[in-house]
Amino acid sequence: MHAHPYPDGPRLLADIGGTNARFALEYASGKIINAKTLACADFASLTLAVQAYLNRWSCGGIRHAIVAIANPVTGDSVKMTNHHWEFSIEATRSELKFDTLLVVNDFAALAMAVPMLRDDEFEQIGGGTAVTEGVIGVLGAGTGLGIAGLMFVDSRWLAIESEGGHVAFSPSDERELAVLQYCWQRYDHVSAERLVSGPGIALIHEALAAQQTPHPAALSTAAIVARAMSRADPLCQETIECFCGMLGTVAANLAVTLCTKGGIYIGGGIVPRLGGYFATSPFRSRFESKGRFSSFNAQIPTSVITAPFPAFPGAAAILADYLDSKTSNPFAVRRAGHESSTGASLPR
């Protein structure tokens, strides 16, 4: 059966991180085309980035749009944590001449997409079996560290927004404690995101290098990852090993916090690029190393999302639910501690 095009034209989908702005068009339910990634640094504002994308495809007359952004969304004003863009949702909607502009947390959108992933769009790391309709945890490292949850309630999936990447970093061994102590010389508060992220990889490398004499030269995150994967630099390998272990701790904490019997899914820009290197890293052993809850976590599957633009289907579902229900909640996802919200009905 062919999906019928939307009578009011294609819908704009955007996934905005601290480094990249990803755009696509949904011309019919589930039919997403023209995905394109733009560099946030190339544009002074979100509006200019949107206009550049639409001009590329000569696509005017967009009426409905959704932006999934790496930031908490608590009202009309949005100021990004890991980029300089800040904007009013209503002013942006008016400037772009949209009828609808929803802005939601990026990992809430990614969480909503998880039930729609095909088997070839994720790779399980380690053992465990998901419980049908069990709570799902989603996390991922990129410019920052995104975290969200997903619950099945009243025949629909509801995303739980979170800023869990900003919890205090918790070291699990002496090496990680040494890294934390190095960071304390520079920061009063060291969050999980400070280390378990793209910029965090460079900081871990710097902290480990400081323990060597002479100190190895500082490297970019891209260089560290490349050297580690080619196994050409022992310090870079140790850095990525440390990073993967830290991510395992974050995932383990999320698992016991939400009782994620439906599984943990890992997105973001870093881990999917590590491929098989991540599969043999300390991530899974750290995930299961949870003291009295080790057997609990061992039953929970952990998977890496490999789809190239995984947040788009979730964002599209949130927008569709909003337009279908005309809900008064402008974000169309469930927030922790906030009851007046809706979620999109997705396949199970």
How would you label these PLM feature ranges?
Residues 57-103, 108-121, 138, 273-276:
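Short beta-strand-loop/turn "lid" adjacent to the catalytic site in phosphate-handling enzymes
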Residues 1-56, 60, 178-348:
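ATP-binding/phosphotransfer module of carbohydrate and carboxylate kinases, centering on a glycine-rich
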Residues 100-131, 222-234, 238-244, 249:
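ATP-dependent carbohydrate kinase catalytic cores
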Residues 107, 143, 269-270:
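Active-site metal-binding loops of divalent metal-dependent hydrolases
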Residues 21, 72-74, 144-148, 203, ...:
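Short, acidic Gly/Pro/Ser/Thr-rich loop/turn segments
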Residues 124-192, 275-276, 282-288, 292-297:
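Glycine-rich phosphate-binding loop of actin/hexokinase-like ATP-binding domains
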Residues 27-28, 80-83, 117-119, 152-155, ...:
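Short, glycine/charged-enriched secondary-structure capping and boundary segments
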Residues 11-15, 62-66, 102, 128, ...:
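Short glycine-aspartate micro-motif
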